[in-house]
Curated annotation (Swiss-Prot):
This is Methyltransferase psoC. One of its GO terms (molecular function) is methyltransferase activity. Methyltransferase; part of the gene cluster that mediates the biosynthesis of pseurotin A, a competitive inhibitor of chitin synthase and an inducer of nerve-cell proliferation. The PKS-NRPS hybrid synthetase psoA is responsible for the biosynthesis of azaspirene, one of the first intermediates having the 1-oxa-7-azaspiro[4,4]-non-2-ene-4,6-dione core of pseurotin, via condensation of one acetyl-CoA, 4 malonyl-CoA, and a L-phenylalanine molecule. The dual-functional monooxygenase/methyltransferase psoF seems to be involved in the addition of the C3 methyl group onto the pseurotin scaffold. It comes from Aspergillus fumigatus (strain ATCC MYA-4609 / CBS 101355 / FGSC A1100 / Af293) (Neosartorya fumigata). One of its GO terms (biological process) is methylation.
Amino acid sequence: MDNFMEMTKKLGHQPELLRLRALDATYDDALEGKLVVAPLDMSEPGKKILDSGTADGTWLRNVRSKQSVPHDYYGSDVEGELFPKDPDGITYFAHSFKDPWPQQYLGFFDLVHIRGSLAGSAPEGPAPVIQNLTTLLKPGGWVQLMEMNAFSPPPNGPAMTDFAKMASEMFTGIGVGDFANNNKSMLEDAGLKNVQEKRVIVNLGKKAKPELHDQSIHGVTGPIVPLTSVARTVKSSFTGEQLDALPARVKEELETEGGQVEMIIAFGQKA
């Protein structure tokens, strides 16, 4: 996924942060405001919560805004440049989830969250990353993973269908495979208990609520150009011309017909 990261950098951090905020609002609506799906008792104050791949902490701030009691929030990202200048009570630290976690955070967290980042585990794949995440948990703590299902997506128009096919071929080519559908079993293999899975349909464009029409399109279409750049480096059924045309096709289809993606949320608890 180095091509994806490099192209995202070239496009600039601010557009990517705006896209992530748009996507967060879209997911928040699909989840009916319940961003913490794992059954962690958030009514009890002082929970320690880590968002890995946090960017500017949008998910953490959104979670915090919904709570009636205080918790301790931490955000990590391989790109420390994305962290906000004002941390606003959130602890940020630069870290790649491929690397061993800092000693002070081992056995420290009640919840460790990742959303939309596990493709970055290539070429080794998510299994060692997930195993690594379990070292961060207190006894009784939870890991929650949320990723897009590109391999068995909901019915859509031809452009969104091609988008899912392109993504599935790209995930296969970089070595992560059908990880969204396999995260549940990987949590089990990592030794977690009470492992569960929730699937959520996210409406986009014309199928979204009117107030989320533009945001949902922006959130999903933003990464297509960088993703197609990765797709060019692996075995693909698409020609270069078809990959060039895909971003505009998806945007037009979402604006005129709408579309859907399925997000798979897998979560498990440390004994």
